[in-house]
Swiss-Prot record:
Gene3D superfamilies: 3.40.50.2020. Belongs to the purine/pyrimidine phosphoribosyltransferase family. GfcR subfamily. It comes from Thermoplasma acidophilum (strain ATCC 25905 / DSM 1728 / JCM 9062 / NBRC 15155 / AMRC-C165). GO terms for biological process: pyrimidine nucleobase biosynthetic process; regulation of gene expression; UMP biosynthetic process. The lineage of its organism: Archaea, Methanobacteriati, Thermoplasmatota, Thermoplasmata, Thermoplasmatales. InterPro entries: GfcR-like (IPR022854), PRibTrfase_dom (IPR000836), PRTase-like (IPR029057). Contains an N-terminal DNA-binding winged helix-turn-helix domain and a C-terminal regulatory domain (or effector binding domain) resembling phosphoribosyltransferase (PRT) domain. It comes from the Archaea. Keywords: DNA-binding, Transcription, Transcription regulation. This is Transcriptional regulator GfcR. Pfam families: Pribosyltran. One of its GO terms (molecular function) is orotate phosphoribosyltransferase activity. SUPFAM superfamilies: PRTase-like. The gene is gfcR.
Length: 198
């Protein structure tokens, strides 16, 4: 586990490279509020921010481990399909960390692959033209970690605007306490919760 000082140094290093707080939060798997808090050196003051750092490097360094997680995600998707009687046409991976999982889930379930890149500053993201389109498709959205759900909400909105129907969101880990976003069910392998504190 990284210390707060190490996180501060890494956040500052990324900021000095020109990354926005949103981009830094994605890279460090922290909420934007936590990144802002770190960069303002508020952690030097009394009290602590309420956030949890999620790191999954032990999974990400080997494709065999990623496919094991993708198999669990596929099982969750099938469970939801059976429980809620819906079909799936496509699997969408949110860049960058959702793409490896979505690619393998797409392969395991024999579904089309959609790649979506959220924009760190604007509301609308971009769908990669090298992969499947969303129009007329029932879509499962996959990402690694959701802190506030903002990226997932924007993805749901953009899929809908492009004529697709988001049917499920699947995450490796969720810091959110909600079970759906914009009416779309959210399932995660791991759900974190901060208990106690001030």
């Amino acid at each position: 586990m990284k210390s707060i000082e190490e996180l501060y140094k890494r956040a500052l290093e990324l900021k000095n490279k020109g990354m926005s707080d949103k981009e830094i939060s994605t890279e460090l798997h922290l909420s934007v509020n936590t990144v802002t808090w770190l960069l303002s050196k508020e952690f030097l003051k009394e009290g602590a921010v309420q956030d949890v750092k999620i790191g999954w490097r032990s999974v990400g360094v080997f494709g065999s481990r990623i496919i094991s997680i993708a198999e669990i995600m596929s099982d969750i998707i099938r469970e939801e399909m059976n429980k809620n009687s819906f079909e799936v046409d496509s699997i969408l991976g949110i860049a960058i960390n959702g793409i490896p999982y979505a690619t393998l889930v797409s392969y395991l379930m024999d579904k089309e692959l959609i790649v979506y890149r959220p924009h760190p500053a604007r509301k609308e993201g971009v769908f990669s033209s090298n992969f499947a389109s969303v129009e007329g498709k029932r879509v499962v959205i996959i990402d690694d970690v959701a802190s506030t759900g903002e990226t997932m909400r924007r993805t749901i909105t953009d899929v809908t605007k492009e004529g697709g129907k988001p049917v499920l969101c699947v995450l490796l880990a969720s810091k959110m306490s909600v079970n759906d976003l914009n009416g779309v069910p959210v399932r995660s392998l791991i759900r974190t919760q901060v208990i106690g504190g001030s």
